[in-house]
Amino acid sequence: YPLLERIIRQTPERFTLLEAESTAYIHTTIYQLPEIPSDADIICYGVWTDPFAAAGHRVFMMDRRNPAHLDFAIEHADAETLRQYVSTHIPLMDTGLHLFTEEAHKAMAHCSIDTLKQRFKVAVVPLTKATYYSFATTEEMVRSTMNLQNIVQDQRLILQSNLPKHPSLFTQNAIIDRPLTAENGNIWIENAHIARNWSLSHDNVITGVPENDWDITLKAGQCISVLPVGAERYAVCLYDFATPYTATDLPAYHLCPDATQLGKVLKALIAGCPTEAQTIEGCKLEVNTERLTEQRLKF
């Protein structure tokens, strides 16, 4: 984590805690970081962005007449709301990188927000020439990975000219018995077997599917997650590509006694038919990591 290391090296000693978001990557080409205000107790690093990219995240709204001044912040902002402030404010997306002095950190556990505002000064520091890549949702994972693949735009740095952009098709540790075509987009296949009778659309993420000979047709936006449970059972989940699930709001998994029943349950879920399979909340699922590792080695 070069950026985190740079922040630690260049941060004044009065700051004792660095908080970092685990579902994001910040790419920057600047080695020397911006100076930190000498009177600040809490530092929030941000990146300049456009309303579309900032949608769904915490956004600092900076006064357009004085971009160094934080006017207010919006939690989980939507693009339309941000566009309403275009003439008066510049959106600065919160990177999730925050610095705290020891006193401010200790006070957070005992004080209200109003008390913190009165006792401590918060400064928002923009990271110049930086880009924020979020991996918090399925859609963001695919989009950020594609953008990182195409990060080099300067043709002088590309050995072969006129190369097409990297497509949004990602396969890792997978066996695919049928080719992906130009009609497929936003496809992510990991630790899975796609048999010859499978048919994919776009906005499909498929993970953990064991070796099979099923006849599966996925509609646009349908995603599959399969996990091994116990000695022989599998848990399968059908979820939506565009839905931003949280750790406490995961879709339910359906328990199957073996791989044969797994295929039948999966077909029923895709067709929208009821199943007799027992369901369990995703956050309560106990995965057999040994079987998961064995399956990965097969692929």
Where are the regions a protein language model picked out?
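Conserved core of the sugar-phosphate nucleotidyltransferase
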Residues: 2-18, 25-103, 126
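A generic "binding-loop/recognition-motif" signal
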Residues: 21-22, 138
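Left-handed beta-helix
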Residues: 5, 16, 30, 41-43, ...
